[in-house]
């Protein structure tokens, strides 16, 4: 079974479990690292996910996967259910919306104003652009970044 099919199947199995507990699905990935396969399910909720929440979803999803016929994942794998973390990637539009006025790290495909990475506050968001407020030495500046220039974006922790 292809990785994409596994992800789609697991997504269909886990969404009703998450809906029952008012959790949301952040991402499902099925990857091979060294010789082992990992099924990773990232979940979230308003106020943040707890270890108990992850254990609950892991137990219920494990039951669903074990009882599914035919077996959606015939090879051996490790199931991991977790939060996307404090420095979670911004992938979907809803992730960017939630990150408004949050401290973010944005990596670019090519430089803008001599920088390829900006770390600052996401102040504005449009379908085509992001506006980041950042510190350049001791001065506060803003940069408007076209979305097609963004290689990666994530929440960041300000030190």
Curated annotation (Swiss-Prot):
GO biological process: ribosomal small subunit assembly; translation
Residues passing through the membrane, by range: none
A GO term from the CC aspect: cytosol
Domain of life from the UniProt record: Bacteria
CDD domains, sorted: YlxS_C
Pfam families (alphabetical): DUF150_C (PF17384), RimP_N (PF02576)
UniProt key word Cytoplasm: yes
Family: Belongs to the RimP family.
Record protein name field: Ribosome maturation factor RimP
Species of origin: Limosilactobacillus fermentum (strain NBRC 3956 / LMG 18251) (Lactobacillus fermentum)
